[in-house]
Amino acid sequence: MCCFSLCVYAQEDSLFTSQGYQEHLNEEFANKDTSPLIDEDLENFKSLDFFEIDSAYIVKATFHKIESQVTFVMPTTTERKPIYVKYGELNFILKGKELKLNVYQSQRLSVDPQYKDYLFIPFTDLTNGETTYGGGRYLDFKIPQKSEVILDFNRAYNPYCAYNGVYSCPIPPEENDLPVKIEAGVKKYKKHSVKKNNSVK
């Protein structure tokens, strides 16, 4: 089963705030038709555990599209082997450091009219296994219309396999391991802790 949210909104949509996004995630998790939670956890669900929204984690980034895109198999937590391309790169400054995140496109979703402009940013950082899920987190993205974009880590969320073992989740590539703490977005679920996989490239 697929393991990430498909709540994708335009980066430039200032009306859809970080708070609104988090409220939408809570609604998704509370709804039995869209929630990844097991029945027992769904019955007791009140809210996901978020870091306090912090504007320091809303950064301006420069998007560079990769013209020569090569397909590859992105490793997952199961034997599922989804095909992706590295669609582009985001360069930004956070906590005084110049950082980069690679942005990927699912080849399956790229032919779906509803999600053809959907991009995917799986990443790890120094909070994993401590305050956040050990397997990393995800950000949703859309193909931008311009090179200057906004990257909002307050919208970082856990893969569904952090909540339910029936899901198959992409493992963030090592090239998307950020050498900083991203104390924004969704925290780890309950006392769930999984060590980062540093062997995936």
Where are these regions (language model features)?
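Acidic, glycine-rich flexible loop segments
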Residues: 120-157
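Mid-length scaffold segments of soluble, non-membrane domains
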Residues: 70-134
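Terminal leader/tail segments of proteins
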Residues: 55-57, 69-75, 144, 175, ...
